[in-house]
Amino acid sequence: MSGQPPPPPPQQQPPPPPPPASAAAPATAPPGLAVGPGPAAGVPVPGLAAGSSAAAPFPHGDSALNEQEKELQRRLKRLYPAVDEQETPLPRSWSPKDKFSYIGLSQNNLRVHYKGHGKTPKDAASVRATHPIPAACGIYYFEVKIVSKGRDGYMGIGLSAQGVNMNRLPGWDKHSYGYHGDDGHSFCSSGTGQPYGPTFTTGDVIGCCVNLINNTCFYTKNGHSLGIAFTDLPPNLYPTVGLQTPGEVVDANFGQHPFVFDIEDYMREWRTKIQAQIDRFPIGDREGEWQTMIQKMVSSYLVHHGYCATAEAFARSTDQTVLEELASIKNRQRIQKLVLAGRMGEAIETTQQLYPSLLERNPNLLFTLKVRQFIEMVNGTDSEVRCLGGRSPKSQDSYPVSPRPFSSPSMSPSHGMSIHSLAPGKSSTAHFSGFESCSNGVISNKAHQSYCHSKHQLSSLTVPELNSLNVSRSQQVNNFTSNDVDMETDHYSNGVGETSSNGFLNGSSKHDHEMEDCDTEMEVDCSQLRRQLCGGSQAAIERMIHFGRELQAMSEQLRRECGKNTANKKMLKDAFSLLAYSDPWNSPVGNQLDPIQREPVCSALNSAILETHNLPKQPPLALAMGQATQCLGLMARSGVGSCAFATVEDYLH
């Protein structure tokens, strides 16, 4: 740099740690997207308010701006997948509050221009980015384009910690690092530079790469690496740029556009290095013990999720014993299949039959299952509304209008129910014209005939009539069919399989097979047809409404007996909100109808069943994965950059 910089202020203290994300920068600094080389080429693009990772609102109807912001999000996510921006936001622009007064910002705080006198080094001015570089980046990179070198080209590009004096070029003070354009020197916390690279001027693109794994930094010029400039860098550094003479203008690219330098290739090199280190982790003489432990973890995982045949085969091949009886695994497997198929009523009844005291001891779990059953009724997938979808005119008019009463646990199931016995199979049986009986989807002979008769008339139905059919039910069932062989060979009689640990309901109903055949034949290409509430059946809608009243009564009784439960209250409110929309599937609360929402319910029920066998609620393999994920998060918070290239997902095949 021509001329030595002025001495730093006396008694310069080490910079304080960066402020939390919520206070790191003012809310008035809206970063944006990259701009063109000239003043007229830039397009103002609102981005994130400084200190926040939530996107700022765009002008209504401006699809181009929305698309640019989406592209920025995609690029940053691809470059830095391990970064949680809710916790550690990425730099996206320069901070209008963390700069010297001679610095001017424009074009969404991505363009920097000098507006001072520029007579002496005391007129130098710098600006920091809105946020420090997160360690979870592993490798971080940004570029600066020299729009104009101005009078003398006294420009510095680099890094600095929070609190470093902004009346200086980067690199002149402690915890400050810079590469200067007029002489090509690098400045490492000192006013004396070291020869490093070529000078840079108007039109050049200078990149700065921070390696948070080995704590080094190198620069690039027009896409070519210039080699290591700094080592032993401290954590929590901010991208920084400094100017000193009139006319100097630079533009920043924090990921708004593709970089000139191929930073992704450099990242791939380091990912390979980190993964090789993991693969070479020494086990020593404990390899046999290590393998045995892993085999037990895999076996327990298969048992936990009900992969019965696979668990048996794996146990044989590894000389292990399966901790849970196979009959018990199959029972859990049947229940899981029912839940994942949306047949909640049958799942509840099967659970009551196989594990009589389970839901009685867990009223909140029962309530969760019943709320999910209500959602499946809306969806048209639960058996209690599916069996009403035969479109018999009489059946739509003859459903009893009084809901099943709640009562004490001592009452007979045929006369009432309490929150401890709220299973459809234990309720009073409703009778319909055209159906002999329909309780929890177990349809008698006449009901089955009526149901399947409608299938044979399917080809002659009009579009409005087809709209009343729940065309998505069979597709959802198929989507959640287990890959395990045993899952495919189980047969149902009232939701309970051929074999049972407590010995009842051996053998499957002939009508169940016919029912499944009937369902299969009803799989038609109706993707263009709009779904309707409860499959469009009036009787099913009435049943759903009465069930909702029962659910409300159950909620009130739970509150009286067990106290207030905010989660239960919100769950019920969200479920009832589905009825406020003519098309619940495309409503703001429609995500509840997504089949994937069945999985947490299935997991909770499965864990509760396992606890009755004194088995862990979660498989050890899942706990180990969770612990590894938490460790990676701790590494990121501790500034260990290698966590960026050691994701758990890389080892899940």
From Swiss-Prot:
Region (Interaction with FMR1): 539-653
Bias kind Low complexity: ranges: 22-57, 398-421
Localization terms from the record: Cytoplasm; Cell membrane; Nucleus
UniProt entry keywords in alphabetical sequence: Acetylation, Cell membrane, Cytoplasm, Membrane, Nucleus, Phosphoprotein, Ubl conjugation
Keyword Cell wall biogenesis/degradation listed: no
Compositionally biased tracts (Pro residues): 1-21
Residue intervals of the B30.2/SPRY domain: 72-259
MF terms (GO), sorted A to Z: small GTPase binding
Taxonomy, superkingdom: Eukaryota
N6-acetyllysine modified-residue sites: K330
Domain CTLH: 328-385
SMART domains referenced in this protein's UniProt entry, alphabetically: CRA, CTLH, LisH, SPRY
GO cellular component annotations of the record: cytoplasm; nucleus; plasma membrane
SUPFAM superfamilies: Concanavalin A-like lectins/glucanases
PTM remark: Phosphorylated in response to stress. Ubiquitinated. Polyubiquitination targets the protein for rapid degradation via the ubiquitin system.
Region (Interaction with CALB1): 326-332
Family assignment from sequence similarity: Belongs to the RANBP9/10 family.
Role summary: May act as scaffolding protein, and as adapter protein to couple membrane receptors to intracellular signaling pathways. Acts as a mediator of cell spreading and actin cytoskeleton rearrangement. Core component of the CTLH E3 ubiquitin-protein ligase complex that selectively accepts ubiquitin from UBE2H and mediates ubiquitination and subsequent proteasomal degradation of the transcription factor HBP1. May be involved in signaling of ITGB2/LFA-1 and other integrins. Enhances HGF-MET signaling by recruiting Sos and activating the Ras pathway.
Domain observations: The SPRY domain mediates the interaction with MET, AR, and CDC2L1.
Protein name: Ran-binding protein 9
Gene source species: Mus musculus
Encoding gene (name): Ranbp9
